[in-house]
Protein backbone atom coordinates (compact mmCIF):
# COMPACT_ATOMS: atom_id res chain seq x y z
CA UNK A 1 0.00 0.00 0.00
CA UNK A 2 1.38 3.41 -0.93
CA UNK A 3 0.83 6.57 1.05
CA UNK A 4 -0.46 9.62 -0.76
CA UNK A 5 0.83 12.26 1.65
CA UNK A 6 2.43 15.15 -0.21
CA UNK A 7 6.13 15.56 0.44
CA UNK A 8 8.04 18.81 0.43
CA UNK A 9 10.20 19.35 -2.65
CA UNK A 10 13.84 18.68 -1.89
CA UNK A 11 17.08 19.70 -3.54
CA UNK A 12 20.38 18.02 -2.88
CA UNK A 13 24.09 18.42 -3.50
CA UNK A 14 27.03 16.06 -3.22
CA UNK A 15 30.68 16.65 -2.47
CA UNK A 16 32.80 13.72 -3.51
CA UNK A 17 36.36 12.74 -2.59
CA UNK A 18 36.60 15.37 0.16
CA UNK A 19 39.83 15.04 2.13
CA UNK A 20 38.99 14.24 5.72
CA UNK A 21 37.88 11.45 7.95
CA UNK A 22 34.24 10.32 7.83
CA UNK A 23 33.91 10.41 11.62
CA UNK A 24 35.15 14.01 11.80
CA UNK A 25 32.75 15.12 9.07
CA UNK A 26 29.81 13.28 10.67
CA UNK A 27 30.53 15.05 13.96
CA UNK A 28 29.71 18.35 12.23
CA UNK A 29 26.80 17.07 10.11
CA UNK A 30 25.06 15.73 13.23
CA UNK A 31 25.03 19.28 14.62
CA UNK A 32 23.37 20.92 11.59
CA UNK A 33 20.88 18.22 10.55
CA UNK A 34 17.29 19.45 10.99
CA UNK A 35 18.25 23.13 11.35
CA UNK A 36 17.30 26.02 9.10
CA UNK A 37 19.74 27.13 6.43
CA UNK A 38 20.53 30.39 8.23
CA UNK A 39 21.14 28.71 11.60
CA UNK A 40 23.35 26.08 9.98
CA UNK A 41 25.51 28.71 8.25
CA UNK A 42 26.01 30.58 11.52
CA UNK A 43 26.93 27.36 13.33
CA UNK A 44 29.37 26.31 10.61
CA UNK A 45 31.06 29.71 10.62
CA UNK A 46 31.94 29.51 14.31
CA UNK A 47 32.77 25.80 14.68
CA UNK A 48 36.50 25.13 15.20
CA UNK A 49 36.66 22.13 12.85
CA UNK A 50 38.50 21.93 9.51
CA UNK A 51 35.67 20.00 7.86
CA UNK A 52 33.27 22.96 8.09
CA UNK A 53 34.75 24.49 4.90
CA UNK A 54 33.74 21.70 2.49
CA UNK A 55 30.43 21.19 4.32
CA UNK A 56 29.57 24.89 3.90
CA UNK A 57 30.40 24.64 0.20
CA UNK A 58 28.10 21.63 -0.30
CA UNK A 59 25.32 23.28 1.75
CA UNK A 60 25.48 26.46 -0.35
CA UNK A 61 25.34 24.31 -3.50
CA UNK A 62 22.22 22.49 -2.26
CA UNK A 63 20.51 25.80 -1.48
CA UNK A 64 21.47 27.18 -4.91
CA UNK A 65 19.95 24.05 -6.49
CA UNK A 66 16.73 24.60 -4.53
CA UNK A 67 16.62 28.25 -5.54
CA UNK A 68 17.38 27.70 -9.23
CA UNK A 69 15.68 24.38 -9.97
CA UNK A 70 12.67 24.51 -7.63
CA UNK A 71 12.22 28.27 -7.11
CA UNK A 72 12.32 27.99 -3.31
CA UNK A 73 13.20 30.86 -0.98
CA UNK A 74 16.49 30.22 0.89
CA UNK A 75 15.06 31.60 4.14
CA UNK A 76 12.40 28.85 4.19
CA UNK A 77 14.79 25.92 3.77
CA UNK A 78 15.62 23.24 6.34
CA UNK A 79 18.38 20.65 6.14
CA UNK A 80 16.33 17.48 5.75
CA UNK A 81 19.23 15.06 5.44
CA UNK A 82 23.00 15.29 5.80
CA UNK A 83 25.18 12.21 5.41
CA UNK A 84 28.85 11.36 5.03
CA UNK A 85 30.01 8.13 3.44
CA UNK A 86 33.50 6.69 3.26
CA UNK A 87 35.52 7.34 0.11
CA UNK A 88 38.74 5.71 -1.05
CA UNK A 89 41.89 6.08 1.04
CA UNK A 90 45.11 7.30 -0.51
CA UNK A 91 48.02 5.19 0.71
CA UNK A 92 51.32 6.91 1.40
CA UNK A 93 54.49 5.72 3.12
CA UNK A 94 56.52 7.48 5.79
CA UNK A 95 60.19 6.52 6.23
CA UNK A 96 61.05 5.25 9.70
CA UNK A 97 64.18 4.13 11.51
CA UNK A 98 66.34 1.21 10.36
CA UNK A 99 64.97 1.13 6.82
CA UNK A 100 61.35 0.55 7.76
CA UNK A 101 58.34 2.36 6.33
CA UNK A 102 54.96 2.99 7.94
CA UNK A 103 51.81 3.20 5.87
CA UNK A 104 49.80 6.43 6.16
CA UNK A 105 46.16 6.38 5.03
CA UNK A 106 44.85 9.73 3.83
CA UNK A 107 41.10 9.27 4.11
CA UNK A 108 38.44 10.80 1.89
CA UNK A 109 34.66 10.97 2.21
CA UNK A 110 31.55 11.78 0.20
CA UNK A 111 29.20 14.43 1.66
CA UNK A 112 25.49 14.55 0.70
CA UNK A 113 23.16 17.31 1.90
CA UNK A 114 19.46 17.64 1.05
CA UNK A 115 17.36 20.72 1.83
CA UNK A 116 13.57 20.95 1.83
CA UNK A 117 11.01 23.68 2.27
CA UNK A 118 10.03 24.18 5.91
CA UNK A 119 6.59 22.79 6.71
CA UNK A 120 4.39 24.48 9.30
CA UNK A 121 3.40 21.58 11.53
Curated annotation (Swiss-Prot):
Q: Note the SUPFAM superfamilies from the entry.
A: Ribosomal protein L22
The UniProt function text for this chain reads: This protein binds specifically to 23S rRNA; its binding is stimulated by other ribosomal proteins, e.g. L4, L17, and L20. It is important during the early stages of 50S assembly. It makes multiple contacts with different domains of the 23S rRNA in the assembled 50S subunit and ribosome. The globular domain of the protein is located near the polypeptide exit tunnel on the outside of the subunit, while an extended beta-hairpin is found that lines the wall of the exit tunnel in the center of the 70S ribosome.
- The protein's gene is named rplV
GO cellular component: a single term: cytosolic large ribosomal subunit
Q: Which family does it belong to?
A: Belongs to the universal ribosomal protein uL22 family.
Q: Which HAMAP family match?
A: Ribosomal_uL22_B
Q: What is this protein called?
A: Large ribosomal subunit protein uL22
One Pfam family, short name please? Answer: Ribosomal_L22
Alphabetical list of Gene3D superfamilies matching this protein = Ribosomal protein L22/L17 (3.90.470.10)
Highest lineage ranks of the organism? Answer: Bacteria, Bacillati, Cyanobacteriota, Cyanophyceae, Synechococcales
Q: How does it assemble?
A: Part of the 50S ribosomal subunit.
GO BP of this protein: translation
The entry's keywords? Ribonucleoprotein, Ribosomal protein, RNA-binding, rRNA-binding
Identify the species of origin. Synechococcus sp. (strain CC9605)
Q: Which GO terms describe its molecular function?
A: rRNA binding; structural constituent of ribosome
NCBIfam families from the entry?
Answer: rplV_bact
Q: Which domain of life is it from?
A: Bacteria
Amino acid sequence: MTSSTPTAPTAQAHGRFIRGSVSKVRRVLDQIRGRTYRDALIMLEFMPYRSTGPITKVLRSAVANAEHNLGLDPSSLVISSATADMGPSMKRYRPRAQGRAYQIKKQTCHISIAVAAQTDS
